[in-house]
Design a protein with these regions (language model features):
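Glycan-recognition and catalytic cores of secretory/periplasmic carbohydrate-active enzymes
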Residues: 1-183
Length: 183
């Protein structure tokens, strides 16, 4: 399950125009827990359902265009990116457990997308809307402390030697502080 969620986060980063995942979004669900084939009709139906169109009055293509919805996304409920660590934390942990080199490549793409779009003259700032395709990225005057304390720590650790804060010897609390596991 953790692998699927992490791979889903990576996919979501790649699916967005800026290469950065939004804070809150809804996807079209597969009918079962098994992988499913792409179903454009199901996507359109879910987009309209999320928009509240029970009577069929809305044009689905117009909604998709106006809402800037990539395929599979039924809604982007919070388009901000506030420099959160959870996605890269998941990539880091899965990488340390599996050793999958593709996870480092994905982490590098995530890092570059974040740096390219959030960098300011002094630091990094949250983004108001990650769905913009017109180059009008709004970097807000906001940098939560978890950017430095957690997000950048996980980006650093995924490219460090695996014995640096090894998951065999340490666990992380919710604030990304490593604690030695008693032996």
């Amino acid at each position: 399950m953790g692998r699927k969620v992490t791979d889903g986060c990576i996919w979501t980063y790649k699916a967005m125009p800026l290469g950065i995942m939004p804070e809150v979004f809804h996807m079209v669900e597969c009918p079962t827990n098994e992988p499913c084939e792409w179903d454009e009709k199901a996507w359109h139906k879910e987009v309209l359902r999320r928009k509240g169109d029970g009577g069929g009055d809305l044009n689905v293509q117009q909604v998709i265009a106006e809402e800037r919805l990539p395929p599979g996304f039924a809604s982007l409920d919070d388009r901000r990116y506030i420099l959160r660590p959870e996605a890269i934390e998941s990539v880091f942990i899965l990488y340390r457990i599996t050793g999958r080199k593709d996870l480092q490549e994905s982490a590098w793409q995530m890092f570059n997308a974040i740096q390219e779009n959030t960098k300011t003259t002094l630091a990094n700032g949250a983004l108001a809307d990650i769905s913009r395709e017109d180059g009008k990225v709004t970097v807000t005057d906001s940098m939560e402390s978890f950017w430095l304390a957690e997000t950048l720590k996980y980006f650093y650790l995924i490219f460090s030697e695996p014995d640096l804060i090894s998951l065999d010897d340490y666990t992380f609390n919710t604030e990304a502080h490593p604690f030695r596991i008693p032996k």
